[in-house]
Regions:
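Loop-to-transmembrane helix boundary motifs in multi-pass membrane proteins
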Residues: 134-140, 321, 353-386, 436
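C-terminal membrane-solvent junction of multi-pass transporters and transport-like membrane proteins
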Residues: 163, 347, 361-372, 396-450
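Hydrophobic alpha-helical segments and their helix-loop junctions in multi-pass secondary transporters
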Residues: 166-202, 210-213, 217-229, 410-422, ...
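Membrane-interface "cap" regions at the ends of multi-pass membrane proteins
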Residues: 1-42, 236-244, 249-250, 256-269, ...
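Extracellular loop-to-transmembrane helix junctions
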Residues: 21, 48-73, 88-92, 96-100, ...
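Hydrophobic transmembrane alpha-helices that form the core helical bundles
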Residues: 99-130, 334-353, 444
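Flexible loop linkers connecting adjacent transmembrane helices
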Residues: 5-12, 46-48, 73-96, 124-126, ...
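Transmembrane-helix boundary/entry motifs in multi-pass membrane transporters
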Residues: 17-20, 54, 80-109, 128-134, ...
């Protein structure tokens, strides 16, 4: 570890993990990201694919999860290599890139609007388990989230999210494998690429369904942005000397420190690859569980009724215990989606305010700003659920306003990654660069399509 001096003979950047045990000790940011993402698009959209299409279209899961992850990899890698988050870097650029800084910053509010759907789903699942009222469960869920995130402890978030991740992975695997006799015979044909049929629960089919799935699963806006701050608070790569209070410049790096940074970049790659495997496995089990319960009975739910419909069938087919396991899985996944991005997006706002001189010019601390931000991001979805009670409209509104953001972030960070003056710190894996650019372009296209369909959904529901 760094000693806090800038002596070039004393390496200020630790060696990257060299054993599996050491690597796993730094997997925390990826665990938190994965837990946060699974409770988003995977819980809400993947079961609809299984319900409407059966095993047809399940080939999309590995395609999407193993493609989108590379754009995210370069978002995190940029910070680990430079000590600046991509948001810091965007702020220093000309307005042709700087506007993305404010787009991402305002995305915190838009993301909070979208969280209203997740909060409503969490409360609904809890109310099915222990009947009280959805309003009571929403209040309790928000209070629990505030109590945890308000401590401003990344270590606590990491431990809790990691525990929730493995709980719902084990539970959904168990639940899905109980129905393997139904879906396994059609698995091979489902893995062969084909044009999917129509999914009325999402209002799309064919290529539109593929674009929608690209937008919803694999790496959502909140978890993706938050991952950068998870890595920062884990103190990886160039974030280490900055955390130690050492003034460091990339031109002052020793050859050994550059080699270590490249090693940290590889660690970020392996983090993302492992995360994509877990996302694919979870999505696979959610899809197959829906195919084996809803599809075989011809039940075609909408986006916000799929979970209770599946729970009811599990009760009928296997008994109440299986429905309880499934609902516990859903609650764990959804709650992890609430706390992870709530922490990460609040850290983003905290750093954004710092760039604008808030803490230098006013008598307010980072801790206070962070806690005020989490209050805002919690109050928005709670108020919208309590007073509007239209989660589908709110979820669609969030998608319409912020759909292309992830693709823009991917492409902008790719440009900035090659703008690093030290060539050895620039990306060298051409195949990974190609996949990241592909993911960025597809995400913009799918985002614009999602915005169009979201607007149509809103108009239809008003």
């Amino acid at each position: 570890m760094s000693t806090g001096t800038a002596d070039a003979t004393d390496h200020r950047i630790s060696e990257p993990p060299s054993s599996i045990k050491e690597f796993l000790s730094y997997m925390g940011p990826a665990w938190v990201f994965t837990a946060s993402q699974i409770g988003g698009g995977e819980v809400l959209s993947v079961p609809l694919g299984g319900a409407y299409l059966g095993m047809e279209g399940i080939w999309l899961i590995p395609l999407i999860t193993f493609t989108k992850i590379f754009g995210q990899y370069y978002l995190v890698r940029y910070g680990v290599m430079t000590g600046d988050t991509f948001l810091d870097a965007l702020y220093e650029k000309g307005w042709w890139l700087k506007w993305i800084f404010y787009y991402v910053f305002l995305g915190g509010i838009i993301y909070a609007i979208g969280l209203s759907g997740h909060l409503g789903e969490t409360a609904g699942a809890l109310n099915t388990l222990v009947p009280a009222s959805t309003e009571v469960w929403m209040l309790l869920t928000v209070l629990a989230g505030l109590a945890i995130v308000g401590l401003r402890s990344y270590g606590l978030i990491e431990k809790l999210a990691t525990s929730l991740l493995w709980v719902f992975l084990i539970l959904i695997a168990f639940v899905s494998l109980q129905t393997a006799g139904v879906w396994a015979p059609n698995l091979a044909s489902g893995l062969v690429p084909s044009m999917p049929g129509r999914v009325d629960g999402l209002g799309v089919g064919g290529m539109a369904f593929i674009l929608t799935m690209f937008g919803w699963i694999g790496a959502g806006f909140g978890p993706t942005v938050s991952y950068v701050w998870f890595a920062k608070d884990k103190v990886m790569g160039m974030f280490e000397p900055l955390d130690d209070g050492v003034e460091i410049d990339k031109y002052d790096l020793t050859d050994e420190e550059i080699d270590r940074l490249k090693g940290w970049g590889d660690i970020v790659l392996w983090q993302n690859l492992l995360s994509s495997v877990i996302l694919a496995v979870f999505s696979f089990f959610m899809w197959t569980a829906a195919a084996a319960t809803l599809h075989v009975r011809g039940i075609q739910p909408s986006g916000f009724t799929v979970i209770p419909e599946m729970a009811a069938i599990f009760t009928t087919q296997f008994g109440q215990w299986s429905a309880v396991l499934f609902l516990l899985t859903t609650v764990a996944a959804l709650f992890s989606t609430l706390i992870g991005p709530l922490y990460g997006m609040s850290r983003l706002w905290e750093d954004a305010f710092a760039l604008h001189g808030l803490f230098d010019n006013y008598n307010i601390t980072r801790d206070t700003t962070f806690r005020l931000t989490i209050l805002l991001f919690s109050a928005i979805p709670l108020a919208l659920n309590l007073f509007i009670e239209a989660p589908l409209i709110l979820f669609a509104l969030s998608g319409a306003l912020f759909a292309p953001a992830i693709g823009l972030m991917y492409l902008s960070v790719m440009y900035m990654s090659f703008d690093i003056d030290i060539d050895s710190l620039s990306p060298v894996r051409k195949w990974a660069v190609a996949l990241a650019v592909f993911a960025g372009v597809v995400m913009i296209a799918s985002g614009l399509w999602e915005a169009r369909s979201s607007i149509e959904t809103i108009v239809g529901l008003l």
